[in-house]
């Protein structure tokens, strides 16, 4: 079995040497960066021994700040490609060592280039799936390689948060304020956790390449711990002035620092036992006092009350009266504040009358003859009030021999005669004057409709809606005084009507409509019986 295992390991070494030689030959023929590619291949070959220093220096020269950024980007890409394609623990570990040394020894521009490369593409240091199953020892080596890659990845993240390298620059956590402490201390504690994960176990303890990488991790762990110690001391000094949320975060950091201090002491003891980091100066780890931890926990429990007391004190300071010099100011008397009266309602401003546009054609002006006629009609319709109202007599008209209500009104004795005499038209108008008024009204209305607006067409009226001036309602009986007053003129109306039918021509329907439309007292919705029947001129159509 042992002979078979030795032959397999020899075969793997032989195949690894062939791969390295082939890669170097291809780089000499096809690569634009021949020297850089050859240095990368020889610095990360399959030989299970530390790399030669001259090849590592050649790589550092290619990624220095004086070189073009294209050369730096190509070198990072070549290292990432070499790391992602290999399944050999020696090649992977040597590549990680080159990157680690470059982070420590090259300027900070290399940090920025690696971070930008990891953002633009997949994380070049992500080796969570790396595994070398060539043998039992290779399994142990592969596990340590994965932890080492996590440490380097966290180192870049810590550099991004702190904006400086802990290994190269002195720690700055001693003078930070509370917000910066709460941001930077978690990054340092996470980096210290990755350091503690690099503790070797099993076969990895005796491997020379792993011991070389572990020595660099130990040297950085002391710097990380010093930065954390300064930050924790600064945090404790500001703890009792923090708000509750910040105090809870600070208490969690302090608890984490206590645990990390114990684990870091064990880590240093293991490294000393295997003679790793003999040239390094191990620092003494001091445990934070547990009594102080209890005081911090009690403060966090009472933090809301303390915050309230402080808030009241701040309010009292803000509301305290300010001192005023008597020379410059005089103390005004106390004035009782009166409630302001309710505002008076705002009066709405009257809108300005809109000026009408002048009627140049005088289409809206009423005719002068029409206005004069209206005045005469108003005078004619004025009713003289009766001073003494006589009682009406109730006479039984059913006992008479008359057959019509008109005859009964004439023959029956009534006390309304006096009232009819008193209810004459004002001004002493007689029948002829009243007839002339009717004729003038008809003539003026005809002239107005024909000549007042020459652009307006004559409307066509319905024959069933004809009416005359002073035409009473067709469905309601006239008042009794008007009936008695006009009974004497009944005979004259009949005679005038018969004469018109015998002598005059048939009146035109339109003229009859014009006459009937001039009566504002007529009912326009009552039919006129037989509108098509020709009629003569009748100034008293109501008494037909």
Curated annotation (Swiss-Prot):
One of its GO terms (molecular function) is clathrin binding. Residues 338-361 are annotated as: Disordered. Keywords: Coated pit, Cytoplasmic vesicle, Endocytosis, Golgi apparatus, Membrane, Phosphoprotein. SUPFAM superfamilies: ENTH/VHS domain, GAT-like domain. It is found in: Membrane, Clathrin-coated pit; Golgi apparatus; Cytoplasmic vesicle, Clathrin-coated vesicle. The keyword Ribosomal protein does not apply. The modification Phosphoserine is found at residue 342. GO terms for cellular component: clathrin-coated pit; clathrin-coated vesicle; Golgi apparatus. This is Putative clathrin assembly protein At5g35200.
């Amino acid at each position: 079995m042992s002979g078979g295992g030795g032959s397999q390991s020899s075969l793997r070494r032989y195949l690894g040497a062939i791969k390295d030689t082939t890669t170097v030959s291809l780089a000499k023929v096809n690569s634009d960066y021949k020297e850089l590619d050859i240095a990368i291949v020889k610095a990360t070959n399959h030989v299970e021994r530390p790399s030669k220093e001259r090849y590592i220096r050649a790589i550092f020269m290619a990624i220095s700040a004086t070189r073009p950024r294209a050369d730096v980007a190509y070198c990072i890409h070549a290292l990432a490609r070499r790391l992602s394609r290999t399944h050999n623990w020696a090649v992977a570990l040597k590549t990680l060592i080159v990157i680690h040394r470059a982070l420590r020894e090259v300027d900070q521009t290399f940090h920025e280039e690696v971070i930008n490369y990891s953002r633009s593409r997949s994380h070049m240091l992500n080796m969570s799936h790396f595994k070398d199953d060539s043998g039992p020892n290779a399994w142990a080596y592969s596990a340590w390689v994965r932890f080492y890659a996590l440490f380097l990845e966290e180192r870049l993240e810590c550099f991004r948060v702190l904006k400086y390298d802990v290994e190269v620059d002195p720690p700055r956590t001693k003078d930070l304020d509370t917000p910066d402490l709460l941001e930077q201390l978690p990054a340092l504690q996470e980096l210290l956790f990755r350091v503690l994960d690099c503790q070797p176990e099993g076969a990895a303890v005796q491997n020379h390449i792993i011991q070389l990488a572990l020595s660099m991790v130990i040297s950085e762990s002391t710097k990380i711990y010093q930065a954390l110690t300064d930050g924790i001391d600064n945090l404790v000094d500001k703890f009792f002035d923090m708000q509750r949320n910040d105090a809870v975060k600070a208490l969690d950091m302090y608890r984490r620092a206590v645990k990390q201090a114990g684990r870091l002491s064990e880590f240093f003891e293991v490294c000393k036992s295997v003679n790793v980091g003999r040239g390094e100066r191990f620092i003494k780890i001091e445990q934070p006092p547990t009594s102080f931890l209890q005081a911090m926990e009690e403060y966090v429990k009472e933090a809301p009350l303390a915050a309230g007391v402080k808030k009241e004190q701040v309010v009292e300071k803000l509301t305290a009266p300010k001192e005023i010099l008597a020379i410059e100011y005089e103390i005004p008397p106390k004035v009782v504040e009166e409630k302001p009266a309710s505002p008076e309602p705002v009066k709405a401003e009257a809108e300005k009358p809109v000026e009408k546009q002048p009627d140049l054609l005088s289409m809206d002006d009423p005719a002068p003859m029409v206005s004069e006629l209206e005045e005469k009609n108003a005078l004619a319709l004025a009713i003289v009030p009766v001073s003494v109202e006589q009682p009406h007599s109730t006479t039984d008209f059913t006992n008479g021999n008359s057959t019509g209500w008109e005859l009964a009104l004439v023959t029956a004795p009534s006390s309304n005669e006096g009232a009819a005499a008193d209810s004459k038209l004002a001004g002493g108008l007689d029948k002829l004057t009243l007839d002339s008024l009717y004729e003038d009204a008809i003539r003026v209305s005809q002239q107005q409709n024909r000549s007042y607006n020459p652009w307006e067409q004559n409307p066509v009226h319905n024959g069933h809606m004809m009416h005359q001036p002073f035409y009473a309602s067709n469905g309601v009986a006239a008042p009794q005084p008007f009936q008695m007053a006009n009974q004497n003129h009944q005979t004259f109306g009949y005679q005038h009507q018969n004469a018109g039918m015998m002598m005059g021509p048939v009146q035109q329907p339109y003229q009859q409509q014009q006459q009937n439309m001039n009566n504002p007292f007529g009912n326009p919705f009552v039919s006129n019986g037989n509108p098509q029947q020709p009629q003569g001129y009748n100034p008293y159509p109501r008494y037909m």
